[in-house]
Amino acid sequence: VKRIAAHLVDRTNLNTNIRHVRRMNGGVMVNIEGQGEIWFDAVVLAAHADQSLALIQDASEDERDILSAFQFQTNLAVLHSDAKLMPKRRGAWAAWNYVSDSLPGQPRVANLGTAGPAVANDLCLTYWMTRLQSIDLAYPLYETLNPRTMPDEELIHGEFHYRHPVFDHKAIAAQPRLGKIQGKNGLFFAGAWTGFG
């Protein structure tokens, strides 16, 4: 991104709020807070599907139908160095380690009503970052989503809340249809929801 931005010095806006986008004169008009409207040949909306849809002032029926098929859940991610959130047997450690209380056939995601976000109700996932990122084993590093018990406080490096895509039947059915809207009338879509997360 930095290399591309270096060639666009006069056209790069960091930490800028976009109010909306709309198609106009074969391109895309972007309404930028504090700057008004600026016309572009094409625009990449690198955001969640629901956020992208909210930005498109003149969304087509296909855009509304496809983008609204994707739901998101809020997860707590904790970056830490506490091995107690990994499997007890070291031989069972993998790059991705999960714990779940649900029984076979039970859903792993609960929706807290139409006004609330979907949240993971019983799934705890720990990424072994040392292995995933080829970090020196002397510096153990893990990222745990929705920890059932928090890591020891002195071993926590940061806590973050993220919205992750929920790959339910509706979302998976919508993914192959992205080609119907990708690049149409100057708008492109990018994000974890367009692929495997």
Predicted regions and their residues:
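Short, well-ordered alpha-helix to beta-strand connector turns
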Residues: 8-9, 40-41, 184
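Active-site phosphate/pyrophosphate- and oxyanion-stabilizing loops and adjacent acidic/basic residues
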Residues: 2
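Alpha-helix termination/capping residues and helix-transition junctions
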Residues: 5-6, 37
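A structural signal for the hydrophobic beta-strands that form the central parallel beta-sheet
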Residues: 12-14, 45, 189
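Conserved beta-strand termini and adjacent loop/short-helix elements that scaffold enzyme active sites
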Residues: 15-17, 33, 190
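A conserved beta-strand/loop element that lines the FAD pocket in flavoprotein oxidoreductases
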Residues: 7-19
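Mid-domain catalytic core of redox enzymes
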Residues: 19-163
